[in-house]
Amino acid sequence: MAADGTGVVGGGAVGGGLPKDGLQDAKCPEPIPNRRRASSLSRDAQRRAYQWCREYLGGAWRRARPEELSVCPVSGGLSNLLFRCSLPNHVPSVGGEPREVLLRLYGAILQGVDSLVLESVMFAILAERSLGPQLYGVFPEGRLEQYLPSRPLKTQELRDPVLSGAIATRMARFHGMEMPFTKEPRWLFGTMERYLKQIQDLPSTSLPQMNLVEMYSLKDEMNSLRKLLDDTPSPVVFCHNDIQEGNILLLSEPDSDDNLMLVDFEYSSYNYRGFDIGNHFCEWVYDYTYEEWPFYKARPTDYPTREQQLHFIRHYLAEVQKGEILSEEEQKKREEELLLEISRYSLASHFFWGLWSTLQASMSTIEFGYLEYAQSRFQFYFQQKGQLTSSPSS
C-alpha cells in the first residue's frame, strides 16, 4: 500500500536525468504466476529504473547500458507496482552486487510520507533479522529489494493443513518480535477513520463511493464495531496486518524446513492479535488470480471451519506458549477465547479493507474492481456480524 501524496502509478512518468536514447524492449524471462494484475512500465519509468539500479547497486549495474537492463512485471499488487530488474548475462559481476532485484514503486498514495519512512526502517530491521528480503535502496518513489527465487502461495493452499500450521507458527514468531515503534494500538481505527474522512471528502463526481457510505451507514457502523472490540480482550502485538497468500512466499529451497517467508510490511504495526489472525482467515475466501473483471473471486464457503481454525490456533499457541505447561482444561479455555476473539476481529478486517478499496477506486490505476471488492467485503461483514450476534457464545 502507498500513502497520501503523489505516487508513481502504471504508465506514469517518473522523470529522471538520463539521456533520451531509446530503451530496447529487453526480453523478459518466463513470467512468474501473477496473483494480481501485472503492470507495464513506461519508457520514462524504465530509464528511471536503470538510474536507480545504477546508483544504488553500483558494480556491474554501472557498466550495463540502459537498453541492456531487463525490467519485467512480476506480480501486480493492489497497492504497489512490482518489477524484476536483471543484468544481462554478458555483463560480469564486479563484487557482491546482486544480479537481479525487485523494484517496488509506490502506487496510489493513501498513508503519508512518515508511514513510508517507518516502513523502510521496518523493512531494514526485518532484513537484518533474516525475516524478510534484503533492502538495497530507498528513494521517494519506492525501493529496491532482494529478489527471492520463490512463488507466492495460492489461495487454496492456505487450507492445506501443513502449510496452515507453518503459517500459524510464522505468524506467532512475527507477533513475538520487539520493534522500535509505538506500542499504542492506534493503527486500526486511526487508519479507518482517515480512510472514511478521505472518502467523504471526495469530489461529487465520486458518486459510487458516496453511495456505499450511505448504503451501509459506515460512520455509525464503525462506532458499533469499536464498541464491540472494546469489549473484546486481545493482546497488542507486532502485527503484519496483511497475511494473505500473495504476501507469503514459498522459497525455492528444497532442503530448508523453514521455507515460508512473509513479505510486504507496509501495513505492519502494533495492533490487536485478533485482527491479524481474523484477517488471515478472511483471505481464505478471496482469490485474486481471476483473469476476468473484477479480477477476484469470492467463495464465502471457503472461510475456515471451526476445526480448521482450531488447527491453526493450536499451532499458533504451541509457538507462543513454548515452555508453558497447561492443563487440558486451561488449553481448551484459551482456544475457545481465541476463537471468539478472532470471530469478532474478522469483522474489523472486512471493514478495514472495504474502506481501503472504496478509496482506492478513486485513486488507483491498477486494473481491479475496487468498488465490487469493497461491496463484497461489506456484505461479508454484515453476514458474519449476523452470525456472531445469533451465536450463543457471542
UniProtKB/Swiss-Prot annotation:
It comes from the Eukaryota. Residues 7-19 have a biased composition (Gly residues). ATP binds at residues 75-81, 104, 146-152, 244, 264. Disruption phenotype: Hindlimb muscular dystrophy. Hindlimb skeletal muscle tissue exhibits impaired phosphatidylcholine biosynthesis and increased phosphatidylcholine catabolism, with concomitant accumulation of choline. Mitochondria are abnormally large and exhibit decreased inner membrane potential. One of its GO terms (molecular function) is ethanolamine kinase activity. It catalyses: choline + ATP = phosphocholine + ADP + H(+); ethanolamine + ATP = phosphoethanolamine + ADP + H(+). The keyword Lipid biosynthesis applies. Pfam families: Choline_kinase. GO terms for biological process: muscle organ development; phosphatidylcholine biosynthetic process; phosphatidylethanolamine biosynthetic process. Residues 1-42 are annotated as: Disordered. The modification N-acetylalanine is found at residue 2. CDD domains: ChoK_euk (cd05156). The keyword Translocase does not apply. Keywords: Acetylation, ATP-binding, Kinase, Lipid biosynthesis, Lipid metabolism, Nucleotide-binding, Phospholipid biosynthesis, Phospholipid metabolism, Transferase. Its EC number is 2.7.1.32, 2.7.1.82. Coiled coil: none annotated. Pathway: Phospholipid metabolism; phosphatidylethanolamine biosynthesis; phosphatidylethanolamine from ethanolamine: step 1/3. Belongs to the choline/ethanolamine kinase family. Has a key role in phospholipid metabolism, and catalyzes the first step of phosphatidylethanolamine and phosphatidylcholine biosynthesis. Homodimer, and heterodimer with CHKA. This is Choline/ethanolamine kinase. It comes from Mus musculus (Mouse). The gene is Chkb.
